[in-house]
A protein has these predicted regions:
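Active-site-facing alpha/beta catalytic cores
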Residues: 2-4, 8-15, 94-249, 253-254, ...
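N- or domain-start disorder-to-order transition segments that initiate the globular core
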Residues: 14-55
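Acidic (Asp/Glu)-rich catalytic clusters
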Residues: 55-58, 85-92, 136-145, 230-231, ...
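Short, contiguous, helix-prone interaction/anchoring segments in small proteins
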Residues: 59-65
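Glycine-rich, N-terminal phosphate-binding loop and its surrounding beta-alpha-beta segment
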Residues: 61, 73-101, 107-111, 115
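Conserved, mostly hydrophobic/aromatic
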Residues: 67, 272
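Glycine-rich anion/phosphate-binding loops
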Residues: 71-91, 124-136, 287-291
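A contiguous, surface-oriented mixed alpha/beta subdomain in the mid-to-C-terminal portion of proteins
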Residues: 238-244, 256-271
Length: 292
């Protein structure tokens, strides 16, 4: 039954569909609990510099980002990192290997959104706990001399984790988003933009042009206060070919992508995603992408 209104009554128009609002722990608190060590900082810095050189043609090694789809378990992540660290050291002359440490999952509809959003995988959504666990994992992996890569989904989470990230991705669902382009323009690490889920390359090229430029957007300070962030632009951005309606890792697709990038006045810098549309979401096909 509806509520009767009188000419003098004022209807409530604020937060009508909000069930609850909880305070988020400030980044500075998490930094005090999990301060960056010299070893972790050196790992991140060295990897960023190596990737910068690769992107600008000063290092002929290949950049490889490898790891699980997303992190869901601390022990499993540490075991994987220990094994990968040995491989990274073994192949360091030819490859710059980063571990894929993804804590957030963009969803087409609904589903588990990642370790930060729901660290216990039980729909309790203990985000403060998830943020702390994410930083702990990044710190410990970097201390194995293994640099980390992740996907950025919002403008707040990076204030808790970005100092431990050597390379970042903007996903196919968010490459066209103005907010994510603005965020990329201020990130301290190199950033890859994926082509659209339908294979559209133009949105990734436009994203790079945008991220190269300065922007102003809303985020939070390390003290947790809402703030206006002004960026300088990020010169270390590139395209990621991830497939779409059809794979786009073949020579013709790569040549077409390079031509479109060059047409926009940008350096033709590409990464190929072995998964997603390029492997038709069948993990056994990933090595076929690699071999091509």
């Amino acid at each position: 039954m509806g509520q009767a209104m009188t000419p003098q009554s004022k209807p409530n128009t604020d937060d009508i569909r909000i069930k609850e609002i909880k305070e988020l722990v400030p980044p500075a608190h998490v930094f005090r609990e999990y301060p960056v060590s010299n070893r972790a900082a050196q790992t991140t810095y060295a990897a960023r510099q190596a990737i910068h050189r690769i992107l600008h043609g000063a290092d002929d090694r290949l950049l490889v980002v490898i790891g699980p789809c997303s992190i869901h378990d601390y022990d499993a992540a540490m075991e994987y990192a220990k094994r990968l660290a040995k491989e990274a050291e073994k192949h360091a002359e030819d490859l710059v290997i980063l571990m894929r440490v993804y804590f957030e999952k963009p969803r087409t509809t609904v589903g588990w959104k990642g370790l930060i959003n729901d660290p216990r995988l039980d729909n309790t959504f203990r985000i403060n706990e998830g943020i702390r666990l994410a930083r702990r994992i990044l710190l410990e992996i970097n201390e194995m001399d293994l640099p980390c890569a992740t996907e950025f989904l919002d403008t707040i989470t990076p204030q808790y984790t970005a100092d431990l990230i050597a390379w970042g991705a903007i996903g196919a669902r968010t490459t066209e988003s103005q907010v994510h382009r603005e965020l990329a323009s201020g990130l301290s690490c190199p950033v890859g933009f994926k082509n659209g889920t339908d294979g559209n390359m133009r949105i990734a090229v436009d994203a790079i042009r945008s991220a190269n430029s300065p922007h102003h957007f809303l985020s939070v300070t390390k003290s947790g206060h809402t703030a206006i962030v002004s960026t300088m632009g990020n010169e270390d951005c590139h395209v990621i070919l991830r497939g779409g309606k059809e794979p786009n890792f073949d020579a013709a697709s790569v040549d077409a992508a390079c031509a479109e990038i060059a047409k926009a006045g940008l350096a033709a810098r590409l990464m190929v995603d072995f998964s997603h549309g390029n492997s038709r979401k069948q993990y056994k096909l990933q090595m076929e992408v690699c071999d091509s």
